[in-house]
């Protein structure tokens, strides 16, 4: 079964302008076998949000906030910070 994705088109455009990462690029992170998924309690309110960090098809290390239900709903996507990149590289494969 393949994942199905959805997002708000206005939010996607604003995200690309602000962070330089399109949601089309962001969904490719879900295909990275070394990607890591974490719960995001700080940003979870009435819904449980999660974060995935991994390499996109463009080889950018990308952090994606999402909600998983029948479909994966993207909330935001951006390139990982220097600190996030270091933590990812130290923990990948473990």
Please provide the spans of the model-predicted regions.
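Ribonuclease/tRNase effector modules and their secretory precursors
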Residues: 1-94
């Amino acid at each position: 079964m393949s994942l199905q994705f959805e997002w708000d088109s206005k939010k996607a455009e604003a995200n690309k302008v602000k962070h330089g990462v399109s949601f089309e690029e962001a969904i490719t992170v879900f295909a990275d076998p070394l990607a890591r998924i974490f719960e995001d309690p700080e940003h979870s309110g009435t819904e449980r949000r999660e974060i995935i960090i991994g390499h996109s098809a463009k080889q950018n290390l990308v952090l994606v906030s999402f909600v998983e239900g029948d479909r994966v709903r993207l909330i935001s996507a951006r390139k990982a910070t220097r600190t996030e990149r270091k933590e990812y590289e130290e923990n990948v494969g473990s």
